[in-house]
Amino acid sequence: MATNAKPVYQRILLKLSGEALQGAEGFGIDASVLDRMAQEVKELVELGIQVGVVIGGGNLFRGAGLAQAGMNRVVGDHMGMLATVMNGLAMRDALHRAYVNARLMSAIPLNGVCDNYSWAEAISLLRHNRVVIFAAGTGNPFFTTDSAACLRGIEIEADVVLKATKVDGVYSADPVKNPDATLYEQLTYQDVLERELKVMDLAAFTLARDHNLPIRVFNMNKPGALRRVVMGENEGTLITKEVAAVTK
């Protein structure tokens, strides 16, 4: 597909997994990966795109194992929320070092560390081309950061949620386990539900579906993939309400 002269999106919600930040380290934050992502976000800002970001916390804390060992789920989820704030602080710092204006907002009050989440303030910042990082998930336990990404995407009236992953999009099966798995170019919400494809958890996905929020799944590890997505190229998998499923 020919590259469009202008971006096809005006405002996006970028969902990054915490694992994406750890690079090859296996834990924590890889500074080189963080800086590369900041540069890619900077490219979008320079294209005039308004960018909201939600980051997971799996690189710093995984509550599932501790929950199995007896930890209260609410406590574990609160710890996970704090992990997303730590990632948000790192991303804000990386963006500032790249000379990008960025604001970090938390769904739980952390005075002196970052701003409290405010819908009106977030909209104002986005309109002034500031990157807004939304941390601490939804502020409630039992909800994933994918749910937070869809919720914030709906609230800020984003054109699309861009879900960055470690694979090239949505496949018919796990491409790591099955090399013959098919990569889908386009799917409908119904396709995903009927085929039980793993895009995100059901609560997050149905939230996006009910509010007709498109989702684009792509590989953030591919250099330039994010830019190609916003310029309308065939990168990753697009999930919408009415587009007929097409496979590569």
Swiss-Prot record:
Reactions accelerated catalytically: UMP + ATP = UDP + ADP
CDD domains linked: AAK_UMPK-PyrH-Ec
Sites where the protein binds UMP: 57, 77, 138-145
EC number assigned by the record: 2.7.4.22
Location(s) in or outside the cell: Cytoplasm
Keywords: Allosteric enzyme, ATP-binding, Cytoplasm, Kinase, Nucleotide-binding, Pyrimidine biosynthesis, Transferase
Enzyme class, UniProt record, top EC level: transferase
Region (Involved in allosteric activation by GTP) location: 23-28
GO molecular function: ATP binding; UMP kinase activity
Regulation: Allosterically activated by GTP. Inhibited by UTP.
Signal peptide: none
Family label: Belongs to the UMP kinase family.
Matching NCBIfam families: pyrH_bact
Free-text function comment from the UniProt entry: Catalyzes the reversible phosphorylation of UMP to UDP.
Record note on quaternary structure: Homohexamer.
Protein's UniProt name: Uridylate kinase
Organism field: Yersinia enterocolitica serotype O:8 / biotype 1B (strain NCTC 13174 / 8081)
